[in-house]
A protein has these predicted regions:
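Conserved glycine-rich cofactor-binding loop
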Residues: 20-22, 44
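Residue(s) in the substrate-gating loop at a strand-loop-helix junction
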Residues: 149
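Substrate-binding pocket helix/loop in short-chain dehydrogenase/reductase
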Residues: 104-105, 109-117, 214
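Short C-terminal tail/terminal secondary-structure segment
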Residues: 2-5, 246-259
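Alpha-helical segment proximal to the catalytic Tyr-Lys
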Residues: 133, 179-183, 243
Length: 259
């Protein structure tokens, strides 16, 4: 085996939740480019189909879109069952679904809180649980990658209390699952992106004053590119190259959390 073979995903299968847009789509494309067959999921079947076709065209790997609601146990279980039926098994799980509510904490409604928590935390737990069970029962030494945020470590912007709470919990859940499932050869790690130009951050990027303020605090002096800046780290964490790396948080932020 050569060093490049360690990073190859040929013959592997992956499920990327939140894979039709932004960071999730970038990760899905990277996995496919490394040879994996991939299912991407989001709420919109149209978005899934469009992104899956683009990924297949650009990488030559199989990519299928399956719409799902990951905020419910039933929705996640159906998604996992359909993915297994489509790909045969799941070697790699990426949790990258995202949503947020931006408003002062005193104005938050219970529905606002639940809307974010159900996707950013509950959905991640349900997906890890369902896919983890599949990996254990099938004796698959799988790879789970959860997408957290730098906001779990530093609160980079105000008015996102539910988002920050969820992302912090995802980091600790990642460590807990890593400890619990290491005995099965399953690794669980988290990525913590900084400021990437995605639909979720569009409201910030389109405000010139905020955009300039953020760039002043990023040593790399640019925002992340979801199509390229997650490629290397996601392939590494999904491959045999990271089989002894688990329970870790990887900051992909252009140096933001260093200062």
């Amino acid at each position: 085996m050569t060093i490049l073979d360690l990073f190859s995903l040929r013959g592997k299968t992956g499920l990327v939740i939140g894979g039709s847009k932004g960071i999730g789509k970038g990760i899905a494309q990277s996995l496919a480019a490394a040879g994996a067959s991939v299912v991407i999921s989001s709420r919109s079947q149209m978005d899934c189909d469009k992104s899956a076709a683009a990924i297949t065209e650009s990488t030559g790997s199989r990519c299928i879109g399956i719409a799902a609601d990951i905020s419910t146990k039933g929705g996640v279980e159906v998604l996992v069952a359909q993915t297994v039926a489509t790909l045969g098994h799941i070697d790699i799980l990426v949790n990258s679904a995202g949503t947020t509510v931006r408003k002062p904490t005193v104005d938050f409604t219970e529905e606002d809180w639940d809307r974010v928590q159900n996707v950013q935390l509950k959905g991640v737990f349900l997906a890890c649980q369902a896919v983890g069970r599949h990996m254990i029962e099938s004796q698959i030494k799988g790879r789970i990658i959860n997408v957290s945020s730098i906001n779990a470590r530093v609160v980079a912007r105000p008015d996102i209390v539910s988002y920050v709470a969820a992302k912090g919990a995802v980091m600790q859940m990642t460590k807990a699952l890593a400890v619990e499932w290491a005995q099965y050869g399953i690794t669980v790690n988290a990525l913590a992106p900084g400021f990437f130009e995605t639909e979720l951050t569009k409201v910030l990027m389109e405000a010139p004053a905020i955009r300039e303020e953020l760039l002043r605090h990023i040593p790399a002096k640019r925002f992340g590119d979801p199509e390229t800046d997650f490629a290397g780290i996601s392939i590494c964490l999904a491959s045999d190259a990271s089989q002894y790396t688990t329970g870790q948080i990887f900051y992909v932020d252009g140096g933001y959390t260093c200062i």
